[in-house]
Amino acid sequence: MRRRDLIKAATALTAMGLSKSSSAIAAESMTPQSARPAFKAAVMRLPVLVPPSEDALNDVRRRNAEAMVEAIENVMRSASSKPRVISFPVLQFTSARRAVSGVPMSRVAVDLVSEPLDKGIFAPVVEACRRHNCYVATSTQEKVPQKEGWFFHTGFIMGPEGLVLRSPKAQAQSAPSVAYLRDIKDEYKSIFGENSIMPVAKTPIGTLACFVEGEAEVLEASRLLASKGAEVILHTSMEDDEIPWTALKQAIGFQCHVFLLTGATSRLIYADNPAGEWAGGSATIIGPDGRLLAEKGGQDEGYAVANIDLAAIDAAREKFGRNTVPAWDLYTDLYSQ
């Protein structure tokens, strides 16, 4: 019964725009545009340094953190108005391809929950969030004190208040030593709470969510976040050209009626290859009608910005929702057959 109750709640939330009375719709049309947050957003396409050894790990983390802060300051100076939310690529602190550097996961992984983020390696970015009143997403290899030996690839959002949310990968491919929530979901929920898998967070700029890399390839992940009320999904990623990423992300924006902000790695920089190894894909901002609003890709680095108006979500749901909002009860019954 619990599952059906959750599904019914999801149906009510995602379809709420479809059952309004004409008087309610008329009243909404008279509401000032400022009733829904509107702001600028940015996505980053940036390189990341890979530590050549365990001894170099702390120095490389420091340099990666400094590069993140520099990127934030650059977009804040250059944009016509300061972005309120920024999506960075994956592993922007700790770097990608842990196995290449030979550093054990127990040394690379960081603890996000035991102490405030402004007391550790993330402090410079949290301080930048406070200076500019913005939210920043990236990911990290994570260890949790509640369960020794568990390692996650975790997307997380920082803001002026510190840690806003953390969301370990649920099923998308990752390093061999990374745990998937699909395999430990019951034990994970018993430790972190019933709503701890793929959470959302209410903020002054709307309801935010975060996922990592290939989780965007699983439509159920985006649907779940939308059913929980997510309005802006921050997608922290590194992409290759074998996957039609732009088409996939546009489908998420349209089918779920969310803003999807993807930060993507441009290059992996090694000690013996300072020019770096280029990654594929692009950093993108997708609107709730599926349109590509901004992009930074190819062998190009920096940021892309776009204006976000959450009223566009309501407009997309009203226009397309009769087709795009799932009949949850129907599909759940069919899935279970």
Give each language-model segment a name.
Residues 5-26:
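N-terminal export signals
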Residues 311-337:
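A conserved C-terminal secondary-structure "cap"
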